Amino acid sequence: MTSAPAKRAGMIVHEQEPYNAEPPRAALAEHVITPVEVFYGRNHGAMPEIDPRAWRLRVGGMVEHALELSLAELQHRFAPVEVTATLQCAGNRRAGLMAYRDIPGQHPWGAGATSTARWRGARLTDVLHACGLGAHVTDIAFDAPDVAPEADPPQPFGGSIPVDKATAPEVLLAWEMNGEALTTAHGGPVRVVVPGYIGARSVKWVERITAQDHPSDNFFQQGAYRLLPADADTARTRPGDGVALGPVALDSEILAPDDGDELPAGPTRVAGYAFAGDDRTVVRVDVTTDGGGTWVQAQLDAQPTPWTWRFWHARVDVPPGRVEIMARAWDSTAAVQPEHAATVWNPKGYVNNSWPSVTVTAS
C-alpha cells in the first residue's frame, strides 16, 4: 500500500491514514483547473500499489460477452476524449452542519472537498457497448481493490450509477488528469469519472465493472453515502435506509475573504465558487452583508458549462464592525440554495448546500 501523496504545503489534513485532506480556501481560489497537488483527497482505505502494466479491467454481468482489458488495450481500442469536470465529496462543507449540531465520527470538511480537473480517457458507454448490454440492465456497478475497515463487514470500495448515466457521453474511464498520467493518489492507473455526481461514484483504481438489474450491494452504496432523516439513529439504520446520493446538489462557497479576516471597512471584493451538479449550470450568485436584507449580484466568470463549477466575484460595501458575509447561488432550473444549515442537517453530514458565510471584522 502507498503512503500519503505529495501535496502542496498547507493542505488541511483530516486524517493521515487513510489520507483525507483538502486545500485551504486561498489555494483553491488560485486556479479554475485545480493542480494535482492541490486537488482534495478522500479515501476510506489504504491506497493500493498497482503496476499499470499488470492492471486489468474486467467487465461482465448482464452482457452478451465479458471483456478483460489491459491499460494499453483500453487506450488503443477506444477513442480517447477529454472532459472537464468538478468532483465534490458528499461531505463538502460538513463543518457548517457540525457548527449547528455535532456529527460524531465524521471528518469536518470545509470548503475544499471539491476540485476541478481535465480528465482524459475512454467513454464508459463505448466499453459497455463493446460488451453488449442486456435488455434488463438498470445499474452499472464498480469495484476497486482498496479495503475499507469502516465498512461493515470490511470490504473493498465500490458503488454504482444508473445505466442511463453510465451510458451518457461525459462518463469516463480516465487515465489522465490535467494532461498527465493519473497518479495513484487520484485513482491511477484508471478511475471512473462521473461528472455531476458525488465523488464517491467516481470510483478510483477501478478493476471490475458489472452490468446488473439492481444497485450495487457494496457498503458504500447501501450503507454509506445515503441521506438519512434528521432524527435517524445511525446505530439502528439498515442497508438501504435513506436515499442513495447521486447528482450533486446546487452549492456555493465564499473563498475570499476568509473567515476571521480583518479588513478595512468599505468596498470589499468577495469571491468564491458555485456548482450546480449533474447537467445543470450556475446562472446567478448573490452576496449580502446584512443578513439577506439586500443583495449584490455577483459577476460570473467564464461561460456556463455542465459538470464544472463557476468562479464568481462581487464588490460589496462592508460596514465597520463584525460582519457576516453570505452568498446564494441559482441554477438553470431556477433552484436556489436553502438558507439555513438547520434545514439540511442530517446525521451523516452530507449535502450541506445552505448559504455559505464568512465573518470578518472591518475597521
Whereabouts are the PLM-identified features?
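Structured, non-membrane catalytic/scaffold regions adjacent to prosthetic-group chemistry
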Residues: 2-363
